[in-house]
């Protein structure tokens, strides 16, 4: 209900009604002076009403007008006071179904059809959030087989708007979308945690001491099993953060770029065996001792000294805990994958790029790397937007995170706050879930805050009652008329009918369960809900370039970073990071076939490449 708007309308109507009432009062005053008896008064009134120009001012006119001006507003006030809490036809609720056609007209970008999100078969959503005053964060809920990828992720990816980050279970999106994105000029990068292809080195993005500490915190907290109690292990976790952050800070400031990786970090931990004999120093202690003599206030030294405050046996336990946090880097493939970096995360906000993170759908062991990438991506993009005056706080290229398998990848600790403020940086998140229960499990008491920061919710179907119940509740109630009939039998039989109003959920939980497979439910902030057809992927003009319509699948290129050194983003400006081109692929392919001509085998040329020459 909108009482303020309705009340203003009523006041205007009553004010307009006052004009004919004043005319009638003046006419009645004239008639009572000119005529005697009811019949003559009626005749004079009839003449005045037929010929308004006959109306004259007379001695009693002020009295009649004053009576109207006093009693009419009083009567209106009493009537409105009596009706203030009554809403005829809306006693139990005003929920109603909206129109997909009307939503489309209101929210689509009419100037450029490509600058739209695809929500349903008939609803488009402009990427210009300032025009429609809605954020671009979207929650997509659908059970297994409901078509989250086919009916939502793929159509929106084929719009080719800005930069994308895809969480890609099994690599389906990479195979389907990689080729068309490269064809359309979008740089494609793949981090494959199934086959251990691609390279991502979190240490390449360290720029401040705080970055190093946040990375250590992310390592410790995201490599723990989900069912690990949070309170009991806090001391060991904090101590591990101290040690790991000290080592990261040392590598960040003192080690060459080629050694700034997790393999070196693990090697340093393995060389930090604490002896009961205080006279015996391990190699790591000697390394930090030499650094302390050079710079007693070095941030790495301060962190390491804080770690060394513990008793010897306690330090041994902390070392074991830290090694357990990094045990996966003993794997040769995993160590190789994180030894260099080719993600170039800040550039996603500067040019169109697509980053595919391929995850195993049956094993979450290595998913924590995606969590660290999430954390660093948000940090890098926020820093880029906030620290570059000409961007005015918003990235020049929109960055969209298609977060499939949302519940299976740990999120940055402050994700709720990130979701609330990412709109102003020209970043949006598509949270893709199987049901509401997953969201409740992840965020406990804060799960409603996640939904609150998403102005659009799209339900594709499922088989979980809690989701049905939640959707039925937020759809609201409608007021409907009911008819009851009573019939009395016997020698003096009688019958009676009565009409009443009753409240009913706009859509009951069982009705949501019975939605057709080709239908979806769309809820947008400040709009009536809509049931519409799911978008048909084969209707998209770009689908012809994908395997879904007979196109060639994307094949991951050769390891073009295999013979290169690490490119540290802290030392290379984001806007000038080296461009990876097809020519480079061809050159590396040639060098593999002709190793005797490999220019980069020369150590001097390696150094030149590292300096960007």
Place the predicted regions along the sequence by residue.
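Basic- and hydrophobic-enriched, low-structure N-terminal and domain-boundary segments
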Residues: 1-146, 150-152, 477, 488-489, ...
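P-loop NTPase motor domains
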Residues: 23-26, 134-427, 442, 452, ...
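A broad, low-specificity signal for short, low-complexity segments enriched in glycine/proline
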Residues: 96-105, 114-115, 120-130, 150-151, ...
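Short secondary-structure boundary/capping segments
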Residues: 180-182, 205-206, 445-449, 473-478, ...
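Flexible domain-boundary/linker segments
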Residues: 261, 339, 390-391, 439, ...
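Short loop or secondary-structure boundary microenvironments that flank
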Residues: 359, 363, 405, 433, ...
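Conserved ATP-driven motor cores of ASCE-family P-loop NTPases powering translocation/secretion/packaging/pilus
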Residues: 419-521
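Extended alpha-helical interface modules used as scaffolds for assembling large macromolecular complexes
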Residues: 505, 544-547
